[in-house]
């Protein structure tokens, strides 16, 4: 037991880390799209083939047809793969050319930018005691008087 370690060593399989997805080594990551489609359509044929048998009622037939229909819908979605999340992405991350992101940490520390306009209650809501930053506010008001 002296040499045992409880840390998980990451392993990379086909560009996927086992820390991100533990099944990367043995899961479905290695299958290509065509393999999945072929296996799926063969499964559809088997499901339809199960309708010809010795069952008496229609309950089994209904279940087989519904599950087969769901499998077909899933295969068609997988085949055409709509990019729904990309179409619906809000463009808030898209910035205009030349945009420079403010240094929010510096602005908070020096009470400049949007942080300079906060009231005492707003400062307290983000755990900043107004009395501790009064000297920064005095410096800002002195600059405004000079202008």
Curated annotation (Swiss-Prot):
InterPro entries: DUF2631
Cysteines joined through disulfide linkages: none
Major localisation: membrane
Keywords: Cell membrane, Membrane, Transmembrane, Transmembrane helix
Protein's cellular compartments: Cell membrane
Its membrane topology: Multi-pass membrane protein
A GO term from the CC aspect: plasma membrane
Coiled-coil residues: none
Pfam families in the cross-refs: DUF2631
Ranges that cross the membrane: 35-55, 62-82
SUBUNIT field: Has been detected in a cytochrome bc1-aa3 supercomplex; its deletion however leaves complex activity unaffected.
The protein's name: Uncharacterized membrane protein Cgl2017/cg2211
Originating organism: Corynebacterium glutamicum (strain ATCC 13032 / DSM 20300 / JCM 1318 / BCRC 11384 / CCUG 27702 / LMG 3730 / NBRC 12168 / NCIMB 10025 / NRRL B-2784 / 534)
């Amino acid at each position: 037991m002296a040499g045992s370690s409880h840390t998980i060593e990451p392993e990379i399989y086909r560009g996927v880390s086992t820390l991100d997805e533990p099944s990367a080594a043995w899961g479905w990551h290695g299958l290509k799209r065509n393999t999945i489609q072929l296996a799926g359509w063969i499964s559809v044929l088997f499901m339809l083939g199960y309708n010809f048998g010795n069952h008496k009622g229609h309950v089994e037939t209904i279940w087989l047809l519904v599950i087969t229909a769901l499998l077909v819908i899933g295969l068609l979605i997988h085949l055409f793969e709509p990019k729904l999340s990309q179409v619906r992405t809000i463009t808030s991350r898209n910035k205009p050319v030349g945009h420079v992101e403010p240094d929010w940490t510096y602005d908070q520390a020096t009470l400049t930018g949007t942080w300079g306009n906060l009231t005492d209650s707003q400062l307290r809501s983000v755990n900043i005691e107004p009395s501790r930053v009064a000297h920064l506010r005095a410096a800002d008001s002195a600059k405004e008087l000079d202008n």
